[in-house]
């Protein structure tokens, strides 16, 4: 990764290698864009699973009573400056300030969305949880408000996102998250 050039290493590994081998190590970007009247919303999650070698993403659009979604999974590469998952790409144009989301080459969706921060990122307290002496969560997250511009095209038609009529929130989290467990019997 180009980031190996920077003095930011926390272990003797390259930046793309987690410090622990737990398969539940993750890094997630989450975005929600709302039309201020409530007529439409767009959501996106993009999750890197470096110890599994995978990246997955979900993109959804709600208009009125209609919801359409696109689920994707792909091989995770070592490059982190522009992250892609199938037809979806996340570009970090100015860290903590300006990010771009594009969907290109898919038959049902296309998108070009620019997120710009309107607030500083607010870091939440670290969350650590154990289950029977095993760490199931150890994660950090920050949240941020922003503005959004761009277009989303799907089978429902075209949405034009602009700063006057839309608002945006996002978060970025990383660490270990084992996720909820299903019990074999009801408790």
Kindly give the residue locations of the regions a language model identified.
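Structured soluble/peripheral alpha/beta segments that form catalytic or ligand/cofactor-binding pockets
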Residues: 1-187
């Amino acid at each position: 990764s180009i980031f190996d050039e920077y003095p930011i290493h926390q272990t003797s590994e390259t930046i793309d290698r987690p410090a622990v081998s737990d398969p539940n190590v993750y890094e997630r970007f989450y975005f929600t864009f709302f039309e201020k009247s409530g007529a439409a919303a767009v959501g996106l999650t993009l999750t890197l699973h470096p110890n599994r070698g995978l990246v997955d993403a979900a993109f959804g659009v709600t208009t009125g009573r209609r919801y359409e979604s696109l689920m994707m999974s792909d091989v995770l590469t070592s490059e982190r400056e522009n992250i892609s998952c199938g037809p979806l790409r996340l570009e970090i144009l100015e860290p903590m300030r300006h990010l771009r989301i594009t969907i290109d080459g898919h038959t049902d969706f296309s998108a070009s969305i620019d997120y710009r921060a309107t607030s500083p990122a607010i870091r939440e307290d670290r969350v650590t949880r154990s289950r029977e002496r095993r760490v199931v969560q150890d994660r950090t997250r920050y949240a941020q408000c922003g503005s959004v511009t761009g277009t989303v095209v799907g089978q429902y038609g075209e949405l034009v996102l602009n700063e006057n009529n839309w608002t945006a929130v996002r978060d970025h989290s990383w660490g270990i998250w084992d996720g909820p467990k299903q019990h074999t019997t009801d408790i």
